[in-house]
Regions:
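Gly/Ser/Thr/Pro-enriched helix-cap/hinge segments flanking short amphipathic alpha-helices
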Residues: 40, 378-389, 393, 397-528
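Hydrophobic beta-strand segments that make up the repeating blades of beta-propeller
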Residues: 64-69, 125-130, 181-186, 234-239, ...
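Short consensus segments that form the blades of beta-propeller domains
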Residues: 42, 72-78, 129-132, 185-187, ...
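An edge-strand/N-cap motif at the start of beta-rich repeat modules
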Residues: 25-46, 51-53, 62-64, 78, ...
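Calcium-coordinating acidic loop motifs
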Residues: 54-61, 89-90, 115-122, 144-145, ...
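Beta-propeller blade repeat segments, especially FG-GAP/WD-type strand-to-loop junctions
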Residues: 24-34, 73-97, 135-152, 190-207, ...
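Cellulosome-associated attachment modules in secreted, modular CAZymes
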Residues: 529-618
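Repeat-based blade/solenoid architectures
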Residues: 39-52, 100-113, 156-169, 210-222, ...
Length: 618
């Protein structure tokens, strides 16, 4: 049976726009709407630190968790500020649904990251938090039912009490189907990172021999299979200050040799950067099938920054520093770096978040497709301007196929400086796109660590191959949406899509139409779509009677938003103006004419009323 691929949720019409900027630098144009409201900005919360997109309630709309660090008290200590969970209402508005547990006010928050730790279909949340007095700690919140969270931190090893945990990254390192957690630590206990193994039932144990032998100041974690051997590797950015020994800020790349054996290979791979790293990000910038690496650096003054580094993956386990030739060689004071294809042309672009008392601007670089980048907007409000940034997270929050950008400000200065911003992407240039959401069955339910690869024919380029990883933590104190987003330019058909799951299962399908969001369930035998989001194949739902398929198109009725299948005269999944025109063209016709919804032998007023009652133009 041929499957028809359907949108996960309908495309949303966008409402009121607060402000609009269209910026040109050289010949480049970038267009964004600043749709920030006081709620989204985090007004009333001081010194923001991180943000994580998720769909905690499984309604198909991406929600936002904001981590706040706090402000100084009269004694010079930071006071924690309650974190917030904002529910996406689906109409470009958000609602604060924060509960006492979600405030996570047990410490000074850094990095939030979502993952389904118990594979129950509900995302859970870990927030790394530091302490002023040694009693505050990090927190793990399990989602017991939609919107109901329990604190299951329950002491060590999860609390990380007395430490300064920074970046975190979820990954199933032992391939048991349970997601594990690596935490970068930048102080205390010999500054050793923490590898926490998920035992199930909400319990974790520290595996002390992994990623913690050397004294480093860990800042960010990035899991990625950089050598394409189907084993997850990890890069750790270490960011000590000038007064510290250079060895404490040498970044690390741990190569996974299998069977629980790891080898630190940063020097031989050419990525042992020592420039006060904060954030880093993996991505295939040139679509050659190898993941490249961008590292953001900073120095301890507002006037001079570390040079960020762009490393091209050579495909043989080594990297080449192409920072200069790529046009990325500039001195910034960078906290967060990120990649996304904001213009849907098929190439990953780079966004840089800078910070400091001098309020250096953020920067957006457009990928030219030839291993070079062009700066789109210099210090422009369209990309966040100058606001002492802390983090940046990408997500298609309005489900229109164009990734939007949430910026986290880190200032405790005057009101309005350093407030968070939500920038809606309005760079609609006619390019096509595809978004893929995954649900693991043998693998961890969140599908973190999965790799999605697509192939399509693009005019002037021939066969193009693109790949995206599902990542839990990226950049610095950030989590992008757990969807794979592809811009495909002018291509109108995706010839093939392959999903390589963490379990080793590989799924493949051909002939996918663009401009839609699809959800796929891990399955060895079939490419299983999951439009109703229950992590069961639509075909299984229909076969077992869990869903109805009135028109026999292999799509559950609840996914077609029609209440009367007979009113969908042309069978396209919607009752709309096309069906109305069919009725009009056959008005008063007798016999078995198209448009006779009630089956009384004539097309007339009763059929029109039935059509109006079932109207669902979606």
């Amino acid at each position: 049976m041929k499957l028809k691929i359907t949108k996960l949720v309908p495309i949303i019409a966008i409402g009121v726009q607060m402000s609009h900027y269209s910026i040109a630098a050289s010949t480049e144009t970038s267009s964004w709407d600043n749709v920030t409201t006081p709620l989204i900005a985090g007004v009333g919360h001081e010194n923001h630190r991180g943000a994580a997109w998720c769909d905690y309630d499984n309604d198909g709309f991406l929600d936002l968790y904001m981590a706040h660090f706090g402000a100084f008290d009269p004694d010079g200590l930071y006071l924690g500020s309650p974190n917030q969970l904002l529910k996406n209402l689906g109409d470009t508005e958000f609602e604060d649904v924060t509960t006492l547990e979600l405030e996570a006010n047990s410490g000074l928050s850094h990095h939030p990251a979502w993952a389904d730790i118990d594979n129950d279909g509900l995302l859970d949340l870990f927030v790394s938090q530091s302490s002023n007095n040694g009693t505050e700690h990090s927190i793990l919140l399990r989602q017991d039912s939609i919107g109901v969270f329990s604190d299951i931190t329950d002491g060590e090893p999860l609390q990380l009490g007395g430490l300064l945990p920074r970046g975190i990254g979820w990954q199933d390192i032992n391939n048991d189907g349970l997601i594990d957690l690596l935490v970068a630590v930048s102080n205390g206990d010999a500054m050793q990172n923490r590898m926490l193994i998920n035992l199930g039932g909400g319990s974790f144990i520290r595996q002390s021999s992994l990623f913690s032998d050397e004294y480093k100041e860990g800042r960010s974690i990035g899991w990625c299979d950089y050598n394409n051997d189907n084993l997850p590797d990890v890069y750790i950015a270490n960011g000590a200050e000038d007064h510290c020994d250079v060895s404490e800020r040498t970044n690390q790349l741990f190569k996974n040799l299998g069977d629980g054996v790891w080898e630190e290979v940063a020097s031989e791979a050419g990525v042992a950067e020592t420039g006060h790293a904060r954030g880093h990000v993996w991505g295939d910038i040139n679509n050659d099938g190898h993941m490249d690496l961008f590292v953001g650096n900073q120095k301890g003054s507002d006037t001079g920054g570390g040079f960020n580094r762009l490393f091209e993956n050579n495909g043989d386990g080594t990297f080449t520093d192409i920072t200069v030739s790529a046009g990325m060689y500039a001195s910034f004071r960078t906290r967060c770096v990120s990649m996304a294809d904001y213009d849907n042309d098929g190439f990953l672009d780079i966004y840089i978040v800078n910070f400091g008392g001098a309020l250096p601007p953020n920067h957006l670089f457009r990928n030219n497709g030839d291993n070079t980048f062009t700066e789109v907007a210099i210090g422009s409000p369209a990309v966040g301007g100058s606001f002492n940034g802390a983090a940046a997270s990408w997500a298609d929050y309005d489900n229109d196929g164009w990734v939007d950008l949430y910026l986290v400000g880190g200032s405790i200065n005057a009101p309005g400086i350093g407030q968070n911003q939500l920038l809606r992407n309005t760079n609609q240039n006619g390019n096509h796109w595809l978004e893929v959401e995954l649900c693991g069955t043998e693998s961890n339910r969140s599908a973190i660590g999965a790799r999605v690869t697509i192939k399509h024919i693009k005019s002037g380029q021939g066969l193009v191959t693109q790949m995206r990883d599902i990542q839990s933590g990226t950049g610095y104190n950030s989590q992008n949406m757990l969807r794979a987003h592809f811009g495909i330019g002018s291509s109108t058909t995706i010839i093939n899509m392959t999903i390589r799951w963490p379990s080793g299962v590989v799924q493949s399908i051909g002939g996918i139409l663009p401009d839609q969001i699809i959800r796929v369930v891990e399955d060895e035998d079939t490419f299983a779509f999951d439009c109703n989001r229950n992590c069961v194949s639509d075909l299984v739902d229909i076969a077992e009677g869990l869903s109805q398929d009135t028109n026999g198109n292999a799509i559950p009725d609840e996914c077609e938003c029609i209440t009367d299948a007979d009113a969908d005269i042309n069978g396209d999944g919607s009752v709309n103006v096309i069906d109305l025109l069919i009725i009009i063209s056959n008005w008063d016709a007798e016999g078995s004419s198209e448009g006779d919804i009630d089956g009384d032998g004539i097309v007339g007023i009763q059929d029109l009323l039935l059509l109006i009652g079932a109207w669902s133009d979606c």
